[in-house]
Amino acid sequence: MGKSCKVVVCGQGSVGKTAVLEQLLYANHVVGSETMETLEDIYIGSVETDRGTREQVRFYDTRGLRDGQEFPRHYFTFADGFVLVYSIDSRESFKRVEALKKEIDRCRDKKEVTIVVVGNKLDLQDQRRVDSSAAQQWARQEKVRLWEISVTDRRTLIEPFVHLASKMTQPQSKSTFPLSRNKNKTSGSLDS
């Protein structure tokens, strides 16, 4: 296990950010239980990667954003990854995720950062307001992975977080530059 990765979990209020983390890390979500507004919590978990290694991840569970509220800038500077959460029964929450993605790109100056998007409340299909294929098309265009999940089915939570941990802790790729010196001792000139 290497360094601890820092992941910021963000989205509109009441989309289930805390419930996702509680269920993922502790299998501790009771459907219908009373919810409380989160100010900020930090969860530390060990997530297995697709390489079979376990990585420590520090999840920053952020306050749900309300209309007109900006996302605090300090989160953009230290995060190794982001989980953007929306609820499939709320078009506004998906629009908030679209805006957050733009904000991350702008604040990080398009620097490499791992982002996954999760559409929560898959169990509320009859109340769906976000078209699944349109959301997937947006995700492909933005070059992020998107999963639809439900905290009522813990198995749906595993793949997005394994992907996240795997991408953030990917071994550095090998250099394409040759390591040995050129055996032909010609001058360094580029002229033919």
From Swiss-Prot:
<feature type="binding site">
    <location>
        <begin position="11"/>
        <end position="18"/>
    </location>
    <ligand>
        <name>GTP</name>
    </ligand>
</feature>
<dbReference type="GO" id="GO:0005525">
    <property type="term" value="F:GTP binding"/>
</dbReference>
<dbReference type="GO" id="GO:0003924">
    <property type="term" value="F:GTPase activity"/>
</dbReference>
<feature type="binding site">
    <location>
        <begin position="61"/>
        <end position="65"/>
    </location>
    <ligand>
        <name>GTP</name>
    </ligand>
</feature>
<keyword id="KW-0963">Cytoplasm</keyword>
<comment type="similarity">
    <text>Belongs to the small GTPase superfamily. Ras family. KappaB-Ras subfamily.</text>
</comment>
<protein>
    <recommendedName>
        <fullName>NF-kappa-B inhibitor-interacting Ras-like protein 2</fullName>
    </recommendedName>
</protein>
<dbReference type="GO" id="GO:0032484">
    <property type="term" value="P:Ral protein signal transduction"/>
</dbReference>
<keyword id="KW-0342">GTP-binding</keyword>
<dbReference type="Pfam" id="PF00071">
    <property type="entry name" value="Ras"/>
</dbReference>
<feature type="short sequence motif" description="Effector region">
    <location>
        <begin position="35"/>
        <end position="43"/>
    </location>
</feature>
<feature type="binding site">
    <location>
        <begin position="120"/>
        <end position="123"/>
    </location>
    <ligand>
        <name>GTP</name>
    </ligand>
</feature>
<keyword id="KW-0547">Nucleotide-binding</keyword>
<dbReference type="GO" id="GO:0032794">
    <property type="term" value="F:GTPase activating protein binding"/>
</dbReference>
<dbReference type="InterPro" id="IPR027417">
    <property type="entry name" value="P-loop_NTPase"/>
</dbReference>
<dbReference type="InterPro" id="IPR042227">
    <property type="entry name" value="KBRS"/>
</dbReference>
<comment type="function">
    <text>Atypical Ras-like protein that acts as a potent regulator of NF-kappa-B activity by preventing the degradation of NF-kappa-B inhibitor beta (NFKBIB) by most signals, explaining why NFKBIB is more resistant to degradation.</text>
</comment>
<dbReference type="InterPro" id="IPR001806">
    <property type="entry name" value="Small_GTPase"/>
</dbReference>
<dbReference type="GO" id="GO:0005737">
    <property type="term" value="C:cytoplasm"/>
</dbReference>
<feature type="region of interest" description="Disordered">
    <location>
        <begin position="169"/>
        <end position="192"/>
    </location>
</feature>
<dbReference type="InterPro" id="IPR005225">
    <property type="entry name" value="Small_GTP-bd"/>
</dbReference>
<dbReference type="GO" id="GO:0043124">
    <property type="term" value="P:negative regulation of canonical NF-kappaB signal transduction"/>
</dbReference>
